[in-house]
Amino acid sequence: MITEAVTRQVEELGWYHTLELPDGQVTKGMFDLRDQMHRYGLPERMDGMRALDVGTWDGFWAFEMEKRGAEVIALDLDDERDLDWPPRRRPKVFPDTPRGAGFRLAKELFGSKVERVNLSIYNATPEEIGQFDFVFCGSVLIHLRDQLLALERIAGLCRGTFVSAEEYDPLSSIVPFPVSRYFADRDSAVVYWLPGIRTWRRMMWTAGFDRVEQTGKFRVKARDGWSVRHVGHRCTKDPAAS
């Protein structure tokens, strides 16, 4: 039962994801992905799977994978200082409160068993967190200084399927070879490199995935009305090459 105090807490938190909580309360997230889930390529059922959500934020995808039957690890960072800030965009003052308040509240309300691990994808290894049958990463890689290293780490963690959904650059996608545009000098969202579609595909192959399938292109709409182009990929490795 959600109390009045919890209702106020939900309303006061800043949410990245729109989550439908027990008793029908809905968080005011920057992105409402509920009607877009079919575009991302999660299996209908994930019973018996061990799944990883890279860059979980409020946990929308982690909780969804758990609902579908998976045992889920959710990866994110607690301290704003540990994020990949471009030097000229780095805040002079950081909040004292740890990130992940929305995730922790939602986990409690859902009665979830998802484990949130405070760890950079750069440092995530099988020795640290094990391997996974299914790895999901959505709208995270574009915010990283070293996208290829992150993909290499994901490939090392994945013993099954990796599903990616990331923003892409339409101009770079026209060029007949893999390129990315540099964005870290812009006074906008924290983005270092915006790859073309071909670039994403080649990076995933370079990182260790033998089969990289483009699953679709779509737009993700924000609460304020603007939208972001995304491209989806499904990646697997050849067992014989492992």
Regions inferred by a protein language model and the residue ranges of each:
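Conserved S-adenosyl-L-methionine
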Residues: 209-220
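Short alpha-helix
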Residues: 99-106, 191-208
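A short glycine-rich, Lys/Arg-flanked "PGG" loop and its adjoining helix->strand segment in the class I
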Residues: 148-161, 168
